[in-house]
Amino acid sequence: MKKYEVMYIIRPNIDEESKKAVIERFNNVLTSNGAEITGTKDWGKRRLAYEINDFRDGFYQILNVQSEAAAVAEFDRLAKISDDIIRHIVVKEEE
């Protein structure tokens, strides 16, 4: 299993309940595909460096994950489709 850091930005005009549902749904995508979430950080609402989809800020979420590539690929696929996530990145950590 490899270690990954996943960062995604949730659109800012979402209510608190829906935000929690999005976080839970994407955590479940990883865990149901065999990933182990070793750490999570909620950076809260931050200003973006540039406008994305007419949004100037967003809710940052960072996950440290230990998994196979398939779980991360599924997260990546679903994050691209989701309207709630305006930007995401997955980085493989050095051993």
Swiss-Prot record:
<keyword id="KW-0687">Ribonucleoprotein</keyword>
<protein>
    <recommendedName>
        <fullName>Small ribosomal subunit protein bS6</fullName>
    </recommendedName>
</protein>
<comment type="function">
    <text>Binds together with bS18 to 16S ribosomal RNA.</text>
</comment>
<dbReference type="GO" id="GO:0005840">
    <property type="term" value="C:ribosome"/>
</dbReference>
<comment type="similarity">
    <text>Belongs to the bacterial ribosomal protein bS6 family.</text>
</comment>
<dbReference type="Pfam" id="PF01250">
    <property type="entry name" value="Ribosomal_S6"/>
</dbReference>
<dbReference type="InterPro" id="IPR000529">
    <property type="entry name" value="Ribosomal_bS6"/>
</dbReference>
<dbReference type="GO" id="GO:1990904">
    <property type="term" value="C:ribonucleoprotein complex"/>
</dbReference>
<dbReference type="GO" id="GO:0003735">
    <property type="term" value="F:structural constituent of ribosome"/>
</dbReference>
<keyword id="KW-0699">rRNA-binding</keyword>
<dbReference type="InterPro" id="IPR020815">
    <property type="entry name" value="Ribosomal_bS6_CS"/>
</dbReference>
<keyword id="KW-0694">RNA-binding</keyword>
<dbReference type="InterPro" id="IPR035980">
    <property type="entry name" value="Ribosomal_bS6_sf"/>
</dbReference>
<dbReference type="InterPro" id="IPR014717">
    <property type="entry name" value="Transl_elong_EF1B/ribsomal_bS6"/>
</dbReference>
<dbReference type="GO" id="GO:0006412">
    <property type="term" value="P:translation"/>
</dbReference>
<dbReference type="GO" id="GO:0070181">
    <property type="term" value="F:small ribosomal subunit rRNA binding"/>
</dbReference>
<dbReference type="GO" id="GO:0005737">
    <property type="term" value="C:cytoplasm"/>
</dbReference>
<dbReference type="InterPro" id="IPR020814">
    <property type="entry name" value="Ribosomal_S6_plastid/chlpt"/>
</dbReference>
<keyword id="KW-0689">Ribosomal protein</keyword>
